[in-house]
């Protein structure tokens, strides 16, 4: 798969297969194409060459396909993107009601279940501005789970958080992984990666430079660029 922004090629010859229940962590320096890669998976960014197939559905120009895939692919960003004028509960029920046409009562039951799952059930009636950054990011995870996705994409979900709030978000992600969620996570949290990832991907200059099982990646990286990166962040 290839992608350009104008004349600049941001993704070069990406070849990746993700199996159900697999946990992949993508790392690499700033500007290496990590975020663009996962944003292409649910068509937030459009790729120019190659195929992206999610659960048997190819991501093409067909908006019906795009909508179907987006309903199956949850996404959590650096910024929480919660609606400030809606309660936490209403933030979580919005998509199931409007996209899945779920009755409000069912959507609320589902939302409360996932708010409990991310350990924030007691904040359901509050508004985003009343919550800490870590709490808001956990709400964002619950909101994505309310669409009952088959895969979750995380784009540096802790990078905008104060250090003391990072652990509460990572704990939720660890639990998700243990419960069998298929996950692709862009992060520099290498402790999390060692605990959760089945496979590590290192990207640089728009390419997958190294792809390996987690233990092998940390114990015996092959590429010099990977070795340098790990020496700087570990």
Language-model region placement:
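ABC ATPase nucleotide-binding domains
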Residues: 228-234
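ABC family nucleotide-binding domain
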Residues: 1-216
């Amino acid at each position: 798969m290839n992608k350009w922004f104008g004349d600049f090629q941001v993704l070069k010859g990406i070849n990746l297969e993700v199996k159900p229940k697999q946990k992949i962590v993508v790392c690499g320096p700033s500007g290496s194409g990590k975020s663009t890669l996962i944003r292409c998976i649910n068509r937030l960014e459009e790729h120019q060459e190659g195929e992206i197939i999610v659960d048997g559905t190819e991501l093409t120009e067909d908006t019906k396909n795009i909508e179907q895939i987006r309903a199956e692919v949850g996404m959590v960003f650096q910024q929480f993107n919660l609606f400030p004028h809606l309660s936490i509960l209403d933030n979580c029920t919005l998509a199931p009601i409007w996209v899945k046409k779920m009755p409000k009562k069912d959507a609320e039951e589902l939302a409360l279940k996932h708010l409990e799952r991310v350990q924030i059930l007691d904040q359901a009636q509050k508004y985003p501005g009343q919550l800490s950054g870590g709490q808001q990011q956990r709400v964002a995870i619950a909101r994505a789970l309310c669409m009952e996705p088959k895969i979750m994409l995380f784009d540096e979900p802790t990078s905008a958080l104060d250090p003391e709030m990072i652990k509460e978000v990572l704990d939720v992600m660890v639990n998700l992984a243990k419960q069998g969620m298929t996950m692709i996570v862009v992060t520099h949290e290498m402790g999390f990666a060692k605990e959760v990832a089945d496979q590590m991907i290192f990207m640089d200059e728009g390419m997958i430079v190294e792809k390996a099982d987690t233990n092998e990646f940390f114990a015996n990286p092959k590429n010099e660029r990977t070795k340098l990166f790990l020496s700087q962040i570990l």
